C-alpha cells in the first residue's frame, strides 16, 4: 500500500517498514507473496493489524493499491483537501496527494492491502490511469466493476489468507490470454526506486536505452504521471522516512538529492501540512 500512517501518539509508518523490509517480525505486519502466475501483476499482499484509529496521515508512492476492510459493516473516512469521503468494505488509491488522512471506525482487526505492479495494473483491468489520478481515493466498485460476489465471498471469511485466495481467483478470471507485460517499464520503475528518486531522467534514459517520449508515454499510460513526477515522489518518501529516524535536516537534504533544505521543507509542508520540525513536535518523535 505504501501508506504513511501515524497511529494515536506513536508514529508508525507502514511505508517506512515496507521500504526497509525490516518490519515483519517487529511490527507483526504479515507479507504474503502472490502465487507465481500472478507475480507479474501483484507486488505483495500485506496484512496490517490495527486498532481504532484517529486521524492518520496517508500517502501513496504511485503504486496501485487496494485496501480491504474485514467486514461489510466496516467503514472508513478518507479526507483530502478538507473534503471527506466515506467508503464501506475498502478503497483504491494509486497516487500521492497532499494532506490526505484516514479514519477507521470501530475495532477493525486488520487491513488487507494488495500492492500491484504499476506497469501492469491498469492494463490488467482495462483502466484509464489518467482518470484514476484525478482523485486520491476511489471505491472498490470503480476499479473492480461488478464485484458484489467477490466482496460477499470475502466477507464470509475471517482469515486474511482465505480472502487472498479469493482475490487471486478473481484476478485470474480477468487476465487476458493476450495480456503482455511491459518489462522495460517495470525496470524503469525499479531503477527509480532503487535510487530513491535521486537519479536524473537523462540517467534513466541512458540506462534503459530509450528516449524521453517513450518514458513519458508509458508512465502516463500505466501510472497517470510523468517519470519526473514519479521520481520526485520517491525522493520525498525516502527522505521523509530517513528524516524520521535521523532527524538531521541538512544531512537528509544532501543525501536525498535536494538542492537545498528549503526545497525539502517545501515538499514536506506540501505533503504533511507542517515543516519538518513542527511535524516532529506534533508527533512527539524521540
Annotate each predicted stretch with a short phrase:
Residues 2-186, 193-194, 201-202, 208-212, ...:
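Alpha-helical bundle regulatory/interaction domains
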Residues 233, 237:
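Structured adenosyl-cofactor binding patch, chiefly the S-adenosyl-L-methionine
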Residues 202, 216-221, 228-231:
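Long, low-complexity intrinsically disordered regions
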Residues 231-232, 281:
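Short Lys/Arg-enriched helix C-cap and helix-to-coil transition segments
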Residues 219-225, 267-278:
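A secondary-structure capping/hinge motif
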Amino acid at each position: 500500500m505504501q501508506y504513511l500512517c501515524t497511529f494515536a501518539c506513536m508514529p508508525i509508518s507502514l511505508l517506512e517498514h515496507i521500504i526497509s523490509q525490516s518490519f515483519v517480525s517487529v511490527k507483526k505486519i504479515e507479507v504474503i507473496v502472490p502465487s507465481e502466475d500472478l507475480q507479474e501483476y501483484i507486488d505483495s499482499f500485506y496484512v496490517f493489524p490495527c486498532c481504532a484509529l484517529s486521524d492518520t496521515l496517508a500517502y501513496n508512492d504511485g503504486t496501485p493499491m487496494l485496501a480491504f476492510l474485514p467486514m461489510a459493516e466496516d467503514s472508513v473516512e478518507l479526507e483530502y483537501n478538507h473534503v471527506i469521503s466515506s467508503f464501506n468494505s475498502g478503497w483504491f488509491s494509486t497516487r500521492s496527494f497532499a494532506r490526505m488522512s484516514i479514519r477507521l471506525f470501530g475495532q477493525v482487526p486488520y487491513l488487507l492491502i494488495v500492492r500491484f505492479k504499476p506497469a501492469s495494473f491498469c492494463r490488467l483491468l482495462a483502466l484509464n490511469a489518467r482518470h484514476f489520478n484525478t482523485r486520491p481515493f476511489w471505491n472498490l466498485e470503480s476499479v473492480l466493476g461488478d464485484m458484489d460476489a467477490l466482496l460477499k465471498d470475502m466477507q464470509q471469511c475471517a482469515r486474511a489468507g482465505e480472502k487472498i485466495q479469493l482475490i487471486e481467483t478473481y484476478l485470474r478470471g480477468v487476465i487476458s490470454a493476450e495480456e503482455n507485460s511491459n518489462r522495460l517499464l517495470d525496470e524503469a520503475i525499479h531503477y527509480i526506486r532503487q535510487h530513491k528518486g535521486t537519479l536524473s531522467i537523462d540517467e534513466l534514459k541512458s540506462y534503459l536505452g530509450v528516449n524521453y517520449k517513450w518514458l513519458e508515454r508509458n508512465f502516463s499510460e500505466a501510472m497517470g504521471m510523468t517519470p519526473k513526477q514519479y521520481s520526485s515522489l520517491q525522493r520525498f518518501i525516502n527522505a521523509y522516512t530517513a528524516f524520521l529516524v535521523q532527524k538531521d535536516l541538512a544531512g537528509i537534504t544532501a543525501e536525498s538529492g535536494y538542492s537545498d533544505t528549503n526545497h525539502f521543507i517545501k515538499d514536506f509542508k506540501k505533503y504533511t501540512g507542517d515543516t519538518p520540525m513542527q511535524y516532529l513536535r506534533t508527533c512527539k518523535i524521540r
